[in-house]
Amino acid sequence: MRRIALVTLLTSTACGAALAQGAPAPVNGDSRWSLGAEAMLAWFKSSPTPVPIITDSYLNAPGVNVLLGGGSVDTNPNAGFKITGAYRVDSRLGIELTGFYIPTRGTSSSVSSSGQPGSIDLYLPFYDVSINQEDVKEISYWPQYRGSAQATLSNNLGGGELNVTLTMPPQDAWRVDLLGGFRVLQLRESYTITTSSPYNPPNPADIWMTTDSFDARNRFYGLQFGARAAYDQGPWVGSAIGKLALGTMQERVSVNGFLETNDYNDYGPTQVFSGGYLALPSNSGDHSRNRFAVVPEVAFNVGYRLDAQATVYVAYSFLYASNVARPGEQINRNINPTQAVAYGNDPPATLIGAAQPNLNFNTTDFWAQTLSVGFAYRF
């Protein structure tokens, strides 16, 4: 028997619309529509990955080194785009619609050991609830097998807003817009841990690979209100905006793990067994809940009007979301290894004792700040 790893809703949405619109009233009576496009760079709050994934000893051993996991990960900076459309009903009333998307970006870290003399052994540490003490699963173990582990974080962000604006009577070059509307946001992140631990010669060539996947999807739906102060003097325009959205964050966490091996069929075709090392039958599946969330945003921008219709601008924004689920925080290292073949149990493995790990559904906050350059045109 063998074997014992919102939001950037963000980027100055209403500010871009302000520059696209220019002054409170169109330059000519027909310029009621405006369109804007932005190229963005976004920096997200790092994604927590507090659970140590790979160490060189037992986690409670003196001088142990954490080689993978046990910190936080980010994919910064993240490139994206935003489109803004606005329609001015009259000199005071307007409608603004914005959509943005920051495509999936990933980052990986890995560690490996040859399993040869002089190499270190790699361990996946966990707390074994069946014996109530710290334990490890060998990923590489000299001289029997070599091993490697990789942790990958990927994320994307998208959303949109629909606002109605009301312009207060202007004061010289200044004006104030009140706004209210609806905001949506989706933040999706995946944290995946893969390992490979094949035998070293002269043992038979085999396959022993695990995958543990934690996926978190957060969808926000809320009503928002805010105000914008805009300055318009000659070719220069600028604005500052504050907004607050209140609503529901729909949090969904999907957990999936499996082992691929041919160790149990005389090294024949690869078999797949449920459960990896951290995503096991007891915590696998889809888990969801709704939480109240607050999403405030502040943004600033400065633009230069090329002519009566075209404007170029730069913008900065900061957005905060009070409640999101992030994948690395959903890992529970309290494990009952009896339920998984990956821990060296003969298939089919049967749970004996407590059904651990379970999903605790941990939540935290999230922020994103962005820099962007844009072009607006009104007609």
Predicted regions and their residues:
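Outer-membrane beta-barrel biogenesis signature
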Residues: L19-G36, F44, P48-T49, L166
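Outer-membrane beta-barrel proteins
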Residues: Q21-P26, V89-S91, T165-Q171, A229-P235, ...
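Outer-envelope beta-barrel architecture signal
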Residues: G29-W33, F81, S91-I95, D172-L178, ...
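Residues on the lipid-exposed face of transmembrane beta-strands in outer-membrane beta-barrel proteins
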Residues: A37, I83-Y87, G160-L166, G180, ...
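Transmembrane beta-strands of outer-membrane beta-barrel pores
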Residues: L41-K45, Y101-R105, F182-R188, Q233, ...
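Extracellular/periplasm-exposed beta-strand and loop segments of Gram-negative cell-envelope proteins
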Residues: P48-S57, A61-N76, P103-N156, L187-R219, ...
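Glycine- and aromatic-enriched membrane insertion/assembly motifs of diderm outer-membrane
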Residues: G69-V111, G159-E161, D177, V184-Q186, ...
